[in-house]
Amino acid sequence: MSRSLRKGPFVDHHLIKKVRAMNLLEKKSPIKTWSRRSMITPEMIGHTFEVHNGKKFLTVFVSETMVGHKLGEFSPTRIFKSHPVKKG
């Protein structure tokens, strides 16, 4: 079930605060975050985030097509190793 439109998108308070501060200073340094649940908003376009995947931080550069998705969607947590090939 999706989030109610009445509530608006969820973005962690500390994360949006950092983005707004960087927009005012016109800085584009990477923002390190553990908040995979935060939704990408239009004011985040052009910023680089380092999103934690449970083991390490993966770099995510936000573009226009990512708006409306969550940060965690671009930082996979599982590694798929192919199924073994049967010889014979």
From Swiss-Prot:
Keywords: Ribonucleoprotein, Ribosomal protein, RNA-binding, rRNA-binding. InterPro entries: Ribosomal_uS19, Ribosomal_uS19_bac-type, Ribosomal_uS19_CS, Ribosomal_uS19_SF. SUPFAM superfamilies: Ribosomal protein S19. One of its GO terms (biological process) is ribosomal small subunit assembly. One of its GO terms (cellular component) is cytoplasm. The keyword DNA-binding does not apply. One of its GO terms (molecular function) is structural constituent of ribosome. Signal peptide: none annotated. It comes from the Bacteria. PANTHER family: RIBOSOMAL PROTEIN S19P FAMILY MEMBER (PTHR11880), SMALL RIBOSOMAL SUBUNIT PROTEIN US19M (PTHR11880:SF8). Protein S19 forms a complex with S13 that binds strongly to the 16S ribosomal RNA. Belongs to the universal ribosomal protein uS19 family. This is Small ribosomal subunit protein uS19. The lineage of its organism: Bacteria, Pseudomonadati, Chlamydiota, Chlamydiia, Chlamydiales.
